[in-house]
A protein has these predicted regions:
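A short, well-structured edge-of-sheet supersecondary motif
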Residues: 19-54, 302-306
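Active-site SXXK
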Residues: 43, 61-86, 113, 160-164, ...
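Active-site helix/loop module of the DD-peptidase/beta-lactamase fold
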Residues: 61, 80-118, 139, 167-207
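Active-site Gly/Thr loop motif
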Residues: 188, 193, 245-304
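Peripheral terminal and inter-domain segments
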Residues: 334-461
Length: 461
């Protein structure tokens, strides 16, 4: 089986060590929290950036990067003759169709769903609870003729998942096991298939919900670069790749500059990227997900970059990668001293945990009645409820792992700092706590919701 070759120094793959160092410095200066990054060129892994406590082998929530894998399933279904790009949604899913579908809804095809040109109304993309998701989405009807307007719609990708499951009798995940995950060596440790969340109707989400590690994403990106070839065989359908990775619809809406990364065209669940290539040259494209989950393919440079992250500003994350990681392929080789600096730096990549000055914790029970939140502090542990209802425990000066969470706390100058990380998810809960003269507490919570929250808590015991 074809394996990705791991080289000792980036220069062996045509990448400058100095370019990688430039990226590491730029990322740190920008405060972007990437978890794991692989940089590949000429089929070789030039550099792996793992920021502890994260790594490149733990499956990670991909958000909308899942869409690119659902698209691949559609490619296989078409190749096997079970559907065509022109298959109409209501013909494949008649049980979900309205009794009298409109002309526009009746003409929505697999192609339209894949290129985000279905014309389905915006409200169709808000279905995340209850059952009968497909029926409820199609009941929303269309507000544009299919193929005439780009509208990013994750429920549209869910409908693709429904179509694949209807004609194969298998979920998208199970369908991809022998066709993609096994041939590319993407199965998890012990041979387990990747996890992909399902709707209450038993259908893989399609547009989100897949968990893969950076190590698992990498061969998918390399196979795309190789036009579907892997180990001398055509694994991914070539026709699908040609469609998926070239613009199928104009996604410019006038809100961004003409060369903006979200204005360059959209394929089949892939975005066309900004590029420094001349017009008409080989493209750069990407699959991406919220908080900067990426697989980016640059055909001109014969290069793939994939990453899992917790970075809300996708544009800034992409910009630094273009400026430094892809540019590293255009730089002269670094000398041995720079290579040595990079190798040392790669062993030191990490995010800090709270430090503890050894002072006593402010023991007590604290409540915020308006928030219905209670915090307990004893001599060696802090308990604070999380949004999922579970009580997170924090130990001063000690990183503890329970299930999929890692936590630590520390006192510094009378203030308490709590930090919780989730190695398989892009979420970090950061809590700064100050105590007043009466012993009451003020919490500033970051990572729960888009903006920091301030909570005042009264000490009751």
């Amino acid at each position: 089986m074809q394996q990705l070759e791991h080289v000792r120094f980036p220069e062996e793959a045509g990448i400058s060590s100095q370019g990688i160092l430039n990226y590491i410095a730029a990322r740190e200066a920008a405060g972007l929290e990437h978890h794991a990054i692989w940089v590949m060129r000429h089929g070789k892994v030039a550099a792996k950036l793992n920021y502890a406590p994260y790594d490149d082998h733990t499956p990670h929530m991909l958000f909308s990067l899942s869409k690119s894998f659902c698209s691949a399933a559609a490619g296989f279904v078409v190749q096997e003759g079970l559907l065509s790009w022109d298959s109409k949604v209501i013909d494949v899913l008649p049980e979900a169709a309205p009794e009298q579908p409109s002309e526009w809804l009746s003409s929505v095809t697999l192609h339209h769903l894949l290129c985000m040109g279905s014309g389905l109304k915006v409200e169709s993309d808000g279905i995340r609870s209850g059952t009968d998701w497909a029926r409820r989405a199609l009941a929303c009807d269309c507000d544009h003729a299919p193929g005439t307007h780009f509208h990013y719609n994750s429920t549209g990708t869910y409908l693709v998942s429904c179509m694949v499951q209807k004609v194969t009798g298998m979920t998208v995940r199970d369908y991809l096991i022998p066709r993609l995950f096994v041939p590319l060596g993407m199965m998890a440790e012990g041979g387990a298939a990747p996890e992909w969340d399902c709707s209450p109707d038993g259908v893989n989400m399609g547009g989100w919900g897949l968990y893969l590690s950076c190590e698992q994403i990498a061969p998918f990106g390399q196979c795309l670069l190789q036009k579907g070839m892997w180990d001398g065989k055509q694994v991914l359908p070539r026709e699908w790749i040609d469609r998926a990775t070239t613009a199928q619809i104009d996604n410019g809406n006038g809100e961004h500059p003409h060369d903006h990364d979200w204005n360059m065209g959209y394929g089949y669940q892939f975005w066309m990227c900004k590029t420094d290539h001349e017009p008409g040259q080989t493209p750069r494209y990407r699959g991406d997900g919220a908080l900067s989950q990426f697989v980016i393919v640059d055909e001109k440079r014969d290069m793939v970059v994939c990453c899992v992250s917790g970075v809300p500003d996708i544009g800034k994350a992409l910009g630094l990668m273009y400026e430094h990681l892809f540019a590293a392929a255009d730089m002269p080789p670094a000398d041995e001293s720079v290579q040595a600096v990079l190798q040392q730096k790669l062993t030191e990549l990490s995010y800090p945990w709270p430090t503890h000055d050894g002072s006593d914790l402010p023991v007590g029970v604290y409540v915020a009645e308006e928030e219905n939140v209670m915090m307990t502090i004893d001599s060696n542990q802090v308990g604070l409820p999380m949004p999922n209802g579970e009580i997170a425990q924090f130990t001063p000066g000690c990183v503890a792992r329970v299930g999929n969470t890692m936590s630590c706390c520390g006192m510094q100058d009378g203030a308490l700092h709590l930090l919780l990380r989730m190695p398989s998810k892009p979420f970090t809960v950061d809590v700064a706590i100050c105590f007043d003269d009466e012993g009451d507490a003020t919490l500033i919570l970051s990572g729960i919701g888009p903006d920091p929250r301030t909570i005042h808590m009264k000490k009751i015991a």
